[in-house]
Structure formats: C-alpha cells, structure tokens
C-alpha cells in the first residue's frame, strides 16, 4: 500500500496532469490519456471528481514520490492518491504504516497482515481486506487461514474480542481483557506483541473510516462501486461526482453558510479575548448536553444496513456487535473518560514509548501533524485561523467516544459544526460502512474537496487516539 518505485511513477501519472511549464517530453499528454483510459473517468474516489484531485493534489503528491520510493516497491494505490491531497500528512502516515507492517517487530509480517484483515473486516471494508489478503500471502502466510478465523491459530483468535471492542465500543476494554491475553499459557501474548497488535488494530479501524469517508475505489474497478459495501440511495447510483462545488451545493445558500460560519468563529474568538468563557460547571453541563444530543445525530433511516459479504464475514466473530451511543436513554452509561486523567501526552505516549518506542515516536508525530495541519483557508476565504474549527471537530469525535476535555467549552461544537457535518462525522467515525455519497455532498457544500479530505484526516486520527487511550489505560491498570 502507498508505494512508489520506477514503474509506479508512470502509473500514478495516469492520475497526474501533464507536467506544467513544458518540462515533460512530448508524449506526456498522451501518457496521461492512456492512464485515464486504464482507470476510466471515475478516478480514485467515488465522491471526489478526478479533476479536483488533478487540480489540487497532483503536483504536491508527485513531489513526494521520491520519499515513498525509498520505503519499498510496488504501486501507488487510490488511498495514497486521495491522501496525497495533504502530502505532509501522507508522509507522516506512511512512516507509521510502513513501521507497523513492513519492518522487523515482535510479530511476524504475515501475522500483522492477518490482524489487519481482522480489523478491516469489523467494518466490512473490502478495500483493506483485499489489500492485506494479498500481502498476507506475499509474506508467506498460510492460505488456509484465509478461509476464515476458525482456520487461524488460537492465539490470533483470542485477539478477536479486543478487536471487536476497539472497533465499536472501546470504552468497554478493561484490564481483565488485557490479562486474558497475557496470562501464561501455550497461546499467550507477550506485552511487546500485544502493544504492536493494538496499535495495528486501531490503525486499521481508523483507516477503514478514511476509506469509506472518502469513497475510495478499488484500483482495478474504475467502473465499480466504492470500496465500501454500503448501499447508496438509488439517486446516487451511477452518477459521477461533480467537479463544480456549486452543482450540489445550493449555490448562494451554501456561500451564505460559509459567511455565517466565519461570523460565528469571529464572535467566539472575540468572546475569548474578552475572557467571557463559561464556568467549569457550565462547561461540564454543555458536554453532557452535547453527549445527549449526539443520540439524535444518526444517518437517515432509509439507509439500509450493509449486508456483510461471506468472504469478509468469515473473519468476524459476533457480527451483530456494533457501535452503541456512549449515552443511551434508559441505560446506565459508563463513566465519562476525563481526558485530563489519562492524556496521550502525559500517559499514553510515555507508556507506548517504553513498550514500543519506534511506534510511539511516529504515532506522536502523526497526531501532531494531523492536529496542526492547516492552510489558513475556509472555502473561498484565505488568511483564516482554523484552529477553533479543527479543535471542535476533534473534540466532537472524542465526545461520541465518551471522552471529555475539562478545559473545552462544548458550546463551540454546536456553534461551529452544522448538523449535516455532525451526521457525517459520527457515521464515518462510528459506523463507516454506512457512509454514502449523499452524506459527503451535504456537509460543507461550498468547500473544496481537499478540505473535506482534511476532515477525514482529523476523523482518522481522533478516532485512533480515542481507541488507543482506552486500550493503553487498560494496560496501565493491568500493570499497576
């Protein structure tokens, strides 16, 4: 995945436009047309017009191919092309991805790809399942294991429960789950092996969110459906994504939405400068209100439940188990995870640095790149401080996973995130297999596609960090 050797340069130029400024040779334009013909007109995403990727991401991705070529050899996949709209993030992502799956570590390479299959299967992500099946066999994996989890070693099967919880309800993970995997026995895990497996599971769960959220298409299926198995409403079928943001946006109404968002950001920033922040009690109440209101933020009832494919279902135990709202009416909710009690910076990072130092450093870098990534633009506006908006998105994702920041006013979430954006965020983060093109089109209707991909990067990282915090807290409690 995400590779660039000498052959791959010509392959990716099927997506990249002919070189500007006359640098390329006379056949470049023809090579571009041939590459387009090989893939069809759909491009790497069912949601993003290929013209947008050519316009916004081609040059920056091409500049980064040299870095990727140093890492391995193979092909550039559709996921890399879309993620390459943000090349600084892609570089950081790839370093961790390569470490997890391709360098020496506690777990054999084939086992790591099998764990990735198990993780992607929880979300019915055929794109990732198929990719890791291929790599599993290429790294010497036993083909019998691909017949289903029941053919895999018991040690791998024992990971299924933690995989299930991390994918759907990470707040349920306890030190007893960790103890069950580490206790002495023929099929026990070492702590080093388990840490690598947990990071890999959360990496692949969140990557499935990115695949569904961006409508990534299988490389060999330019005329097919997205990598997701989720059905789209009939009106969406067979309609290529439009390159004009106004076509699906409601035109001037969408432009007014942008202006209204800019005004709300300005007012919030002014109130902060005047030190008109809410009290601690009020901020806690606003979090509880936001958590309760998230119950009402769900996909449309007319979206059908995806039907798991048998080739994917065979890697899943308890397939009916899925995300449930952290706070449900009429039930005893688990206690809120107060971020200050177990932070990534002070607790999670230090633990993983002790047990998996190479991974800890790259994880921390990737989180920082995602959190700080900005081009200071919003739709047609430039020179904008977007930190408040990015923090609202990050904290809302953590909110739906039950994590609260004591120093954050959750009233900002309601002011900055429109309902369609909340629906999209919650769907992609919690049940990504239900994501549709219509959801993608309905939020931020006047924004560039690269900005929507940016939202998906925040989704990927915030979701991964939330699940890791629950898992690492359970390990800390086990060790103490």
Curated annotation (Swiss-Prot):
GO terms for biological process: cellular oxidant detoxification; cellular response to amino acid stimulus; cellular response to glucose starvation; cellular response to L-leucine; cellular response to leucine starvation; cellular response to oxidative stress; D-glucose import; DNA damage response, signal transduction by p53 class mediator. Residues 223-238 have a biased composition (Low complexity). Residues 308-480 are annotated as: C-terminal domain. The modification N-acetylmethionine is found at residue 1. Residues 20-43, 221-251, 272-291 are annotated as: Disordered. Disruption phenotype: Sesn2 knockout mice are fully viable and do not display any overt developmental abnormalities. When kept on high fat diet, they display higher insulin resistance and glucose intolerance. The oxidative stress induced by acute lipogenesis upon refeeding results in increased liver damages in the Sesn2 knockout mice. Any condition, like obesity, that triggers chronic or acute endoplasmic reticulum stresses have the same consequences in these mice and can lead to liver fibrosis. Sesn2 and Sesn3 double knockout mice display insulin resistance and glucose intolerance. Phosphorylated by ULK1 at multiple sites. Ubiquitinated at Lys-175 by RNF167 via 'Lys-63'-linked polyubiquitination in response to leucine deprivation: ubiquitination promotes SESN2-interaction with the GATOR2 complex, leading to inhibit the TORC1 signaling pathway. Deubiquitinated at Lys-175 by STAMBPL1, promoting the TORC1 signaling pathway. Ubiquitinated by RNF186; ubiquitination mediates proteasomal degradation. Its EC number is 1.11.1.-. Residues 66-239 are annotated as: N-terminal domain. One of its GO terms (molecular function) is GDP-dissociation inhibitor activity. L-leucine binds at residues 374-377, 386, 451. It is found in: Cytoplasm. Belongs to the sestrin family. Functions as an intracellular leucine sensor that negatively regulates the mTORC1 signaling pathway through the GATOR complex. In absence of leucine, binds the GATOR subcomplex GATOR2 and prevents mTORC1 signaling. Binding of leucine to SESN2 disrupts its interaction with GATOR2 thereby activating the TORC1 signaling pathway. This stress-inducible metabolic regulator also plays a role in protection against oxidative and genotoxic stresses. May negatively regulate protein translation in response to endoplasmic reticulum stress, via mTORC1. The N-terminal domain has an alkylhydroperoxide reductase activity. This is Sestrin-2. It comes from Mus musculus (Mouse). The lineage of its organism: Eukaryota, Metazoa, Chordata, Craniata, Vertebrata.
